[in-house]
């Protein structure tokens, strides 16, 4: 690389990743094959449209690449329809929402502070700007989704669309109950499985594909693919919907809202990376990987509990959990900064019914997907939790410096994919 400034910064980032314990639940490591595809000459090709129906010439090979990605996605998820063009999970959600409802219609989504996502109706996001939004959350006592309460809220606000899914909810979501609620109020159901897609395809979480009208996901996080999005559908893929005043099959409506509705040319180099990720996730080794992610995450959560920390909802069924720091003289923002200082990266996170602002937060979110990709086992994950607890409980700069040395020495033994 001739650009020394960029090259040096990339090398610094590589060293940072090598010497830090990555616990951000939305991050992971891709394989070398995926990185090679994303960095390939495919980035040169413009390919507006869909396979065999492009607005540019010279697309025969990229048609094959996108068709292969679609075929593999359908096989992996057990779907009848897949659109692999969305540049991100947020853009996948935008396109899916626009295919199902119209501006001004009502959306019922999970409260952001209870574990939802910006695109599920937040007032600062397109979903809350162009649509009327209502929210459900978790029970104050159990910190679990109360489906009876969701039904009550749905009957009160009569949404046109219900969104199920979360970015910081550590328990299994019952998608069938959400579909029952949606059917009760004649609403569409959109399931956002961005965080749990890997668990679903590996068989460790119930699937939304034949339950929801549409399912969206990112292709990174627990899928270990490149940064990107995907839209899927099962038995409802050809259901007739009213789109721009006309009846249209759902999959055709989605194709229209992705291109030309919300995007121009697809990122063919990223689609190639997605295709590789789908193939990798179809292997038995991927199921073993997800099983280990769940084991490692549970081990860490249980250690925090044994050390007197409160875990939101009492535990975890997936790849993440939230630690409530309210009993410490420490905000989530403080903890994030402190742990960054000892080479452990995670993020501050609001907890349900949080009294602190989102910029401070009362909790931290911990994910086990990335460390498992580096080969950490349950005992290693226990050691990671011990590092964190030591750092959070000490107020000694000398001790923090010692912890940092131990963290670097520990994590260097694990290769990055």
Swiss-Prot record:
Entry-annotated residues carrying N6-(pyridoxal phosphate)lysine: 221
EC number per UniProt: 2.1.2.1
Q: Which PROSITE patterns match?
A: SHMT
Q: Which cofactor does it need?
A: pyridoxal 5'-phosphate
Q: Which residues bind (6S)-5,6,7,8-tetrahydrofolate?
A: 112, 116-118, 247
Q: Which CDD domains match?
A: SHMT
What subcellular compartments does it reside in? Cytoplasm
List, in alphabetical order, the GO biological process terms annotated in this UniProt record.
glycine biosynthetic process from serine; tetrahydrofolate interconversion
Q: Which GO terms describe its molecular function?
A: glycine hydroxymethyltransferase activity; pyridoxal phosphate binding
**One Gene Ontology cellular component annotation held by this UniProt entry:** cytosol
Name any one Pfam family assigned in the record: SHMT
Query: Pathway it acts in?
Result: One-carbon metabolism; tetrahydrofolate interconversion; Amino-acid biosynthesis; glycine biosynthesis; glycine from L-serine: step 1/1
Domain of life per record: Bacteria
Chief localisation class: cytoplasm
Alphabetic keyword roster: Amino-acid biosynthesis, Cytoplasm, One-carbon metabolism, Pyridoxal phosphate, Transferase
Task: Write down the InterPro entries for this protein, in alphabetical order.
Answer: PyrdxlP-dep_Trfase, PyrdxlP-dep_Trfase_major, PyrdxlP-dep_Trfase_small, Ser_HO-MeTrfase, Ser_HO-MeTrfase-like, Ser_HO-MeTrfase_PLP_BS, SHMT-like_dom
Reaction equations catalysed: (6R)-5,10-methylene-5,6,7,8-tetrahydrofolate + glycine + H2O = (6S)-5,6,7,8-tetrahydrofolate + L-serine
Q: Does the keyword tRNA-binding apply?
A: no
Role summary: Catalyzes the reversible interconversion of serine and glycine with tetrahydrofolate (THF) serving as the one-carbon carrier. This reaction serves as the major source of one-carbon groups required for the biosynthesis of purines, thymidylate, methionine, and other important biomolecules. Also exhibits THF-independent aldolase activity toward beta-hydroxyamino acids, producing glycine and aldehydes, via a retro-aldol mechanism.
Assembly and partners are described as:
Homodimer.
The entry's protein name is: Serine hydroxymethyltransferase
């Amino acid at each position: 690389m001739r650009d020394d400034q960029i090259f040096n910064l990339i090398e610094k980032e590589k060293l940072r990743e090598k010497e830090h314990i990555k616990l951000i639940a939305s991050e992971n490591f891709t394989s070398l094959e995926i990185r090679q595809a994303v960095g390939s000459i495919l980035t040169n090709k413009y390919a507006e449209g869909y396979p065999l129906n492009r607005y540019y010439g010279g697309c025969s090979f990229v048609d094959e690449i996108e068709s292969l990605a679609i075929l593999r996605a359908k096989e992996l998820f057990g779907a009848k329809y897949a659109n692999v063009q969305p540049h991100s999970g947020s853009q996948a959600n935008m396109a899916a929402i626009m295919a199902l409802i119209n501006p001004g219609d009502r959306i019922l989504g999970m409260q952001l502070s209870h574990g939802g996502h910006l695109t599920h109706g937040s007032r600062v996001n397109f979903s809350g700007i162009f649509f009327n939004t209502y929210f459900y959350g978790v029970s104050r006592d159990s910190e679990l989704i109360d489906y009876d309460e969701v039904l009550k809220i749905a009957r009160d606000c009569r949404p046109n669309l219900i969104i199920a899914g979360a970015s910081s909810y550590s328990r299994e979501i019952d998608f069938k109950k959400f579909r029952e609620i949606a059917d009760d109020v004649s609403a569409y159901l959109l399931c956002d499985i961005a965080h749990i897609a890997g668990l679903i395809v590996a068989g460790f979480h119930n699937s939304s594909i034949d339950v929801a009208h549409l399912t969206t996901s990112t292709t990174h996080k627990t899928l270990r693919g490149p940064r990107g999005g995907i839209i899927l559908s099962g038995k409802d893929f050809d259901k007739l919907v009213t789109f721009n005043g006309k009846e249209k099959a759902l999959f055709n409506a989605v194709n229209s809202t992705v291109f030309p509705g919300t995007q121009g040319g697809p990122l063919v180099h990223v689609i190639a990376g997605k295709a590789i990720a789908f193939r990798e996730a179809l292997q038995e080794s991927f199921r073993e990987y997800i099983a280990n992610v769940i084991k490692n995450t549970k081990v860490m959560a249980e250690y925090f509990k044994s050390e007197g920390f409160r875990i939101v909802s009492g535990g975890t069924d997936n790849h993440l959990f939230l630690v409530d720091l309210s009993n410490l003289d420490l905000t989530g923002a403080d903890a994030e900064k402190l742990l960054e200082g000892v080479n452990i990266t995670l993020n501050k996170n609001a907890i349900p019914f949080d009294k602190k602002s989102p910029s401070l937060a009362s909790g931290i979110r911990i994910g086990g997907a990335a460390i498992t990709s580096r080969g950490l086992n349950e005992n290693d994950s226990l050691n990671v939790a011990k590092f964190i607890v030591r750092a959070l409980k000490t107020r000694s700069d000398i001790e923090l410096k010692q912890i940092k040395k131990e963290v670097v020495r520990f994590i260097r033994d694990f290769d990055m994919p």
